[in-house]
Amino acid sequence: MNKFSKFCLELSSLSDIKPSIFLSPASGYRARCEFGISKNSYTMVEDGKRIYMDVSKIPHHSIQKIMPKLLKYINESSILKSKLFQINFRSSGSDVLATMIYHKKLKNEWSIEAKVIQAKFKNLSIIGRSKNQKITNDKENVKRICKYKNSSL
């Protein structure tokens, strides 16, 4: 007996509710994701091996759309590229937050360069992080408005 069948059996003694299974989409299902940065590419680790990529099918479509363009701008900027080792993406559906994590203290020139790159996207906010340091040029979170019975939540 699998977990779902066992759960249904246990629930049946408490309620008449019949649970259903809904499959997740095969791509674009992650609103949060983390990528390493190495050799001008995003990286992930699979089976102990580093995989290099420009885009991934796992994140939400809004993140997928931004990934290759942002990577291109990062690789063209020595200020943004220097000592960058990780990027975390968050998405609310349309808006995307990219947190760029560094192995060095960030200077004012980083903030200026990040603003220039951020201005090229209508739905991207960039945060810079380093040890004991956080630089925010715009929003530092993403919000999602959900509709329920003609009300916004």
Provide a role label for each language-model segment.
Residues M1-L153:
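Accessory RNA-recognition modules of RNA-modification enzymes
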